[in-house]
């Protein structure tokens, strides 16, 4: 029988529910259980694919091409699993499916209501996420906070699950903020009490509290919360602020969180062996070197827009025994006059993805600087496309060369729209999304990074591609197409073999990086940056 764990939040949002859920998932996986995890987002968008990065942060793409919440990146990195389209559910997605069924007459004339039709659809998504992955345990995080009007159907569905599958198969975990008032010199439990009262008013009695605190709460506070919120004192778990996120599973294990969960769900499984994880955390906290990486982006005011990129850089730093000193460079500020001042001390330069014209000329200037000064450079998605544009302009002397996305009237569209995208009008969910194979060129730096594999599978999110009408001209000038689709139609990776490391990929390698298994192209980039640093 599948076990269901539901994680809700109270008092404030952005309290770390996703990290708690992911950490618990890691602990349960290390007990030998097959775990999957999903996120419920109460907003009305179908998915975050068309949302501004300033609103939502990065869009995380799964193997099967779902555009999802960035929390799924945390889930995959912590638990080291590959999620699917059932792992992110929004209000918009549920309502659109229910309304489509209503239009097709599938409800046989019934009045379509929140209960039971919306709640049934939500419960179906929970069960599908478990059955499609054949999981022993599914953890479902509900976005937002208890009390939000948007969350009510989701919480009602969670309440009903207890009756549907039995109390021994369901556990409710509520995460809240435990604020410390410096002037009073004490922690305040009242916000948590009111949050739990609100949750209980909706028919859900939490079995565990996870309290987010800046400093240890003490047993007295835990006992008080246990008494007022009707949970066992040992089931009041602290989630303290830490230096590194990957410490959190160890901190939760030290408080027996996973054992309490297993006892409640009647799971008789071995204790989690976290030896390897602990060794990784110890290494992360004692890195011997520091490497300066310049990230040239257009959304740098909100680092969450590049969350997976940053994590992938860190992961590759771990295996190189180096901390990543990240310098956020606003692409709009990069000009021929400022580029040396902005990038002159960088050991490596990364140019990540994005959409739209703003900042692209600055990115092109950064790529030119990396090429001309032989600074290790990694381009991702739009960064790959602009690498081709830069080379066309400044090496092939194709004046005004550009992407057709950025300049539809360019004389030299070295980047053009994909053929199967030409007649598509909708923006949402219509990109080339998900896992696709990439055939590597033997002897290239890219193939070397991937241990000379012939084919790798990586996740994509794009609508434009390299224009093959220019391929011969590029190749004759020494530009290497080191990764292509198996049918040789789509350019996936480009590089300059005479540079320390000058590689750009159409796909998003960061989406498959893990702290204990860094992505190979990122690792090759950081290795080159470390060597460049030592050569200074």
Curated annotation (Swiss-Prot):
For this UniProt entry, the molecular function terms from Gene Ontology, in alphabetical order, are: ATP binding; CTP synthase activity; glutaminase activity; identical protein binding; metal ion binding
Q: Which UniProt keywords apply?
A: ATP-binding, Glutamine amidotransferase, Ligase, Magnesium, Metal-binding, Nucleotide-binding, Pyrimidine biosynthesis
The name of this protein is CTP synthase
In the UniProt record, the gene name given for this protein reads pyrG
Start and end residues of each Glutamine amidotransferase type-1 domain: 292-535
Q: A single GO BP annotation from the record?
A: pyrimidine nucleobase biosynthetic process
Where is UTP annotated to bind?
Answer: 13, 188-193, 224
The UniProt note on how this protein's activity is regulated states: Allosterically activated by GTP, when glutamine is the substrate; GTP has no effect on the reaction when ammonia is the substrate. The allosteric effector GTP functions by stabilizing the protein conformation that binds the tetrahedral intermediate(s) formed during glutamine hydrolysis. Inhibited by the product CTP, via allosteric rather than competitive inhibition.
Q: In which pathway does it act?
A: Pyrimidine metabolism; CTP biosynthesis via de novo pathway; CTP from UDP: step 2/2
Coiled coil feature spans: none
> What organism does this protein naturally occur in?
Streptococcus mutans serotype c (strain ATCC 700610 / UA159)
PANTHER family per UniProt: CTP SYNTHASE, CTP SYNTHASE-RELATED
Q: Any idea of its EC number?
A: 6.3.4.2
User: Can you tell me which residues form the catalytic site?
Assistant: 381, 508, 510
Q: Which residues bind CTP?
A: 13, 148-150, 188-193, 224
